[in-house]
Amino acid sequence: MRHYEIVFIVHPDQSEQVPAMIERYKTTITTHGGQIHRVEDWGRRQLAYMIEKLAKAHYVCMNIECDQTTLDELEHAFKFNDAVLRHLIVKMKKAETGPSPMMKEVQREEAKKAAAAQPTEAQA
């Protein structure tokens, strides 16, 4: 089996359905004997360019290990899901299990927001 990194972008109006989508894709992978090494929900982020007149979308990154038939099934699911705006599947040499650079940035942003919220709570 090969290692893959999958990034897919979901329509911002469908953000509440992302956890169910991730669970459905994880079930597809595990039932076919694959493994999931990392799942990161990057949240709603600014797009580099407009897609279907949208400036923001919900990003998800998955690092998996599966065979070609499972990968074909996932790609088919991405293509025919109207909520998925774009998807990218990249073959990796080995499994990535640590946090991605994008996830580190998300964690830094959340830490800044939490730090900014603490002084205002102390003043109130």
From Swiss-Prot:
The record's SUPFAM superfamilies line, in alphabetical order, gives:
Ribosomal protein S6 (SSF54995)
Q: What does this protein do?
A: Binds together with bS18 to 16S ribosomal RNA.
What this protein is called in its record is Small ribosomal subunit protein bS6
Biased composition (Low complexity) is annotated at: 114-124
Entry's Gene Ontology cellular component terms:
cytosolic small ribosomal subunit
Q: Keyword Aminoacyl-tRNA synthetase on this protein?
A: no
The highest taxon in the source lineage is Bacteria
Q: Which organism is it from?
A: Burkholderia vietnamiensis (strain G4 / LMG 22486) (Burkholderia cepacia (strain R1808))
Single Gene Ontology BP term? translation
The keyword RNA-binding appears for this protein: yes
In the record, the note on similarity to other proteins reads: Belongs to the bacterial ribosomal protein bS6 family.
Coiled coil located at which positions? none
Q: Name one GO molecular function term.
A: structural constituent of ribosome
Task: Please provide the record's keywords in A-Z order.
Answer: Ribonucleoprotein, Ribosomal protein, RNA-binding, rRNA-binding
Q: Where is this region: Disordered?
A: 96-124
